């Protein structure tokens, strides 16, 4: 009679999230008819990506042995991860007959697939995305051998559900009996659906779409663009929200999206590869599956078409410029050979040159330029269009000479900076002396570049953090990373920039860099809010320092030049625009 009071729980799609080789969490997903779960071909551990869609075994950093071990450990249970997302487990309290059925029929088969996949990956011929496609094919593509496992399991759980309905206790009250019948009929329906080969074919097809699109995204985007994509979207997605930071902080996992199979397959048939790539990119940026319908697909297709037209116009424009340059070169050669008509040729060349300048100014907006801290204005701008910031003295300090900086830090209150060598100070000045970024931060376009990285309390003050993806070129080297801005509000409510630096990082570590918890732990302890602050719009560099800020369509640059020879670029910081969300 113990069974009478048992709590039955039937999970139609994902019952278990596998992290490494252990069951860590049970959860349920609400799916509409026709929806499917797609897995993205990126392996995460905690906040960070440890394998991209294009990552092969030979690409893994051998110096970071723990990273290689994490990937291989995750692959050891990859088939269980896929099964639990796409098919699910039947979990019944106080009765393990469905679990026994799974263990007897599917467990060994799934383990074999994971083991074979791990061996294939370690040979180095397949990327992770290609491996994921292969595993889906092996698990769900029916043939005489493989199809039998799923069909046998479906038949077995159907039979067990029937037996349980027939064996239901006679003294069970009517309401409880109806509940049991609903649950058990649901299990029967699930088992019977395993015979639907079209369902499995569709599942394979959808995963191929995701894997192919992610491969193209990884191959087409530059490193800094990929960093922007991952920082902006995928690491804030569904699984992280469902399980929480603590649950996945040291676990391997895949992110997913629930989407209408009909909409996605229809989009591929109607629009093709470029639109599918953009759709998947929007998913990675955080677009929810329920928001992706036919109307949204058409909107994305329109954006892609317009982008292609712009590229074609740009190519056509460049071709015209090349032809014009060739004509100029020919005119000059003819002018040298002829002794007559020289002045006319020069006059024609001058007219041609003048026309070119007019066309260029019409096509390209004139960038705002700041030289040596004094802005050279190219157009009127109301004060209301700019945000007001103050700069804390600890940030202003970095504009001084290394010797002066060291002297001030050594007698200051921040222990982390005391006793640093002059060489260390010089290195740190390169990544901290970037106050020109405030020109962008104050502008109306700031939100197109900076993303909100959260707030936290520390040292008695509430602090806000913003980050932007960037690249720093110095000493013949190019480093990708993020521009970090930390602020608190003074007594008047004005944001004070107390932290400003370029932090070199990679795609694999971008999660920790933007994670609020990690930032709070490493943030400076106490900031003296009474120290000298300066209005950002009044800030100028010391005499003799030369830099320019140039704002373009997709980037903002700060260029430091040699004061003695301004043709020589000493350092360049590029801040990139955030990915476009449609």
Swiss-Prot record:
Region of interest (Disordered), residue spans: 326-386
Annotated Basic residues bias: 330-339
Coiled-coil stretches noted in the UniProt entry, renumbered to this chain: none
Biased composition (Basic and acidic residues): 344-354
Similarity comment: Belongs to the UPF0329 family.
Protein name, as recorded: UPF0329 protein ECU07_0070
Species of origin: Encephalitozoon cuniculi (strain GB-M1)
Organism phylogeny: Eukaryota, Fungi, Fungi incertae sedis, Microsporidia, Unikaryonidae
